[in-house]
Amino acid sequence: MHKDWPAMADELNVAIKEVRLGTPDVMKAFSAMAQAATKGGALDAKTKELIAIAIAVAIRCDGCVAFHAKAAVKLGATRDEVMEAMGMALYMGAGPSLMYAAQAVEAFDQFAAMQPGA
C-alpha cells in the first residue's frame, strides 16, 4: 500500500484550518502545548520528533505519521535514526506497529526526497 504522505499533510492542513477557525481558543492552547512539548530541553527537538513518530506508529495515526515524518526531515533526522525509532515502536506495539512502521519509513523517504539536493 502506497500513500502520498506530502499530499496527506497538505490536505490535513486545510482541514485543520477549519478546526482552528471553529475552535480558536482550543487550537491556541493546543499550539501552545505543541510548542512547549517540542522545544529543546534535556531532549533536543529532533529527538522529540523521533519519539513523536514512534508514538504515531504505536497509536496508528496516519496524519500524525505525516506531520512528524515531515518535521523529522526538517530537523535533520537520518533514516537510520528513524529506523531505530521504528524499532522502539515495534517493540512497544508489536505486529500492528510493523504495518505503521513501514508506512512511517515510506513517509520519511518521500519528504526527504523533496529536500534540495536529494
What feature does the model see in each segment?
Residues 32, 54, 88-91:
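Residues within well-ordered alpha-helical secondary structure of globular protein domains
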Residues 67-79:
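Iron-sulfur (Fe-S) cluster-binding segments and ferredoxin-like electron-carrier domains
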Residues 42-59, 80-86:
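Immediate flanking context of iron-sulfur cluster ligation sites
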Residues 76-86, 113-118:
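Charge-rich, acidic-biased intrinsically disordered regions
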Residues 1-47, 99-118:
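Acidic, glycine/proline-rich low-complexity segments that act as flexible tails and inter-domain linkers
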Residues 61-64:
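Short cysteine clusters
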Residues 83-109:
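C-terminal structural segments of small proteins and small subunits
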